[in-house]
Amino acid sequence: MDFNLSNSQSDIYESAYRFACDVLDQDAQTRISQKILSTELWKKAAAYGFAHGPVSHQFGGSELGALDTALMIEALGKGSRDIGLSFSLCAHLCACVIPLYRFGSSELKDKYLESLVTGKLIAANAATEPDAGSDIYNMQATAQPCEGGYILNGKKIFITNAPIADVFIIYAKTNPDHGFLGVSAFLIEKGTPGLNVGEVIPKDCLSNCPWSEIVFNDIFIPQSQRIGMEGAGGAIFHDSMIWEKGCLSALFVGGLARLLETTLEYAKARQQFGKAIGQFQSVSNRIIDMKLRLEQCRLMLYRACWKHDQGQDAEADIAMSKLLISEYAVQSGLDAIQTFGGAAMDQELGLVRHLLNMIPSRIFSGTNDIQKEIIARKLGLRGTSS
C-alpha cells in the first residue's frame, strides 16, 4: 500500500496551487468584501482546468479521475481565499459538466460541453425546491410529456450560479407516480421563454457566490434537450452528488490546510508572557487537533475517491468523508479564532468569514443528517444495504 502521490498527481496539485495563489487569490479580499464574483477570473480558472474533471480531451477536458480532480480542487481551496468563486466553479463542474458528460446525448455534448469545460458558458444545477430539500424526490416541478418534448412548470430555490448562468441542468417529474424513477433531467438555456431567474439572494456566507430562485412557466423543452432516458433523472442526480460531495469536500480540505498554516504561523510569532503562545499547552493542543483533523480528512477523502476510480461502491466512503470534513472544518475554524483571540475579529484577516464559509459544508450536497442515513443504510440498519 503506497500512500505517496504519483509524480503526475503532485504536479497537478502544485500547478493548481500556484495558479490559485498567483491568479485567483490576487485582490480576493476586495472582491469578497464587495460581494463580487469576477466572471473574468471564473472563466480563466475554468479554462485553466478547474472545470475539466473527467471530461475527455475530445471536449477540452483533462480525463482526470475522482482522486486527481479532488487533488486539484484541494489545491484551489488552499491557494485562494475566494471560496465563493471556488464554490461556484465546483458546482458548475460536479453538478452540471460531469452529468452532461456522463449521461448526455452526443448531440447535447457536441453542442454544449466544450464551451462549459473551457469556461465560455456557466451552468447552474436546479434540483432543490421549497418542499424538496433533503427529500429531493418529493419535488413538485413537472415536465409534462407533449408532442415533440415536454412542458415544464415549477419553482427551484437556492440555485448556485443561477443569476450568472448561461445554461441550467433541471430536474423535474415526468411521471409523478413513479417516485425516483419518475424524475428526468433536462438542459435549458438562459432566455428560454417562460424561464424566470430571480434576483441574487444575499447570504452571510459564500457571499460572493451568487444564488437565486428560478421559476418555470409553461416552458417547452424539446425532447433533444433531455439528459439521459426519461425517468433516469434520479440516477443522474445521485451520480452527480457522489462527485459533488467528494470534490466540494476537497475544497474544504484545502481550506483546512490554509487555516492550519495561518494559525501555526501566528502561534509561533505571537508573544505573551515572554514567549510564543504556541509554547503554551492549551494553544499547542488546539493546533495539534487541527493537524489531526486535516490528515484524517485527507486520508478518508483520498480513499473514497480512489475507490470510486476503481469502480468500487464508494457511496458510504464519500458520505463518511463529507460528514467528517464538514464537521472538522467548522471545529478548526472555531479553534483558529480561539487561538487568534481578539485579532480574529479583524475583517482583513478573514477568520470569522472563513468560519461562516465552512458552515454550509454541513448542509449542501445532502445535509450531514442525510449522510448519516446513507451510512446507516449501507451498514444494513435501514433495510437493504445494496
Swiss-Prot record:
Q: What is the lineage of its organism?
A: Bacteria, Pseudomonadati, Pseudomonadota, Gammaproteobacteria, Enterobacterales
Role description: Involved in the biosynthesis of 4-methoxy-2,2'-bipyrrole-5-carbaldehyde (MBC), one of the terminal products involved in the biosynthesis of the red antibiotic prodigiosin (Pig). Catalyzes the desaturation of the L-prolyl-[PigG] to yield 1H-pyrrole-2-carbonyl-[PigG].
Q: Where is the active site?
A: 244 (proton acceptor)
Q: Where does FAD bind?
A: 125-134, 158-160, 270, 281, 338-342, 367-369
Checking InterPro entries in the record gives: Acyl-CoA_Oxase/DH_mid-dom (IPR006091), Acyl-CoA_Oxase/DH_mid-dom_sf (IPR046373), AcylCo_DH-like_C (IPR036250), AcylCo_DH/oxidase_C (IPR009075), AcylCoA_DH/ox_N (IPR013786), AcylCoA_DH/ox_N_sf (IPR037069), AcylCoA_DH/oxidase_NM_dom_sf (IPR009100)
Q: What is this protein's name?
A: L-prolyl-[peptidyl-carrier protein] dehydrogenase
Q: In which pathway does it act?
A: Antibiotic biosynthesis; prodigiosin biosynthesis
Cofactor(s) essential for the protein: FAD
Q: Does the keyword Transmembrane helix apply?
A: no
PANTHER family in alphabetical order: ACYL-COA DEHYDROGENASE (PTHR43884), ISOVALERYL-COA DEHYDROGENASE, MITOCHONDRIAL-RELATED (PTHR43884:SF12)
> Which Enzyme Commission number(s) are on file for it?
1.3.8.14
Q: Which UniProt keywords apply?
A: Antibiotic biosynthesis, FAD, Flavoprotein, Oxidoreductase
**Free-text disruption phenotype from the record:** Cells lacking this gene show a white phenotype.
Source organism of the structure: Serratia sp. (strain ATCC 39006) (Prodigiosinella confusarubida)
Catalysed conversion reaction: L-prolyl-[peptidyl-carrier protein] + 2 oxidized [electron-transfer flavoprotein] + H(+) = (1H-pyrrole-2-carbonyl)-[peptidyl-carrier protein] + 2 reduced [electron-transfer flavoprotein]
CDD domains from the UniProt entry: ACAD
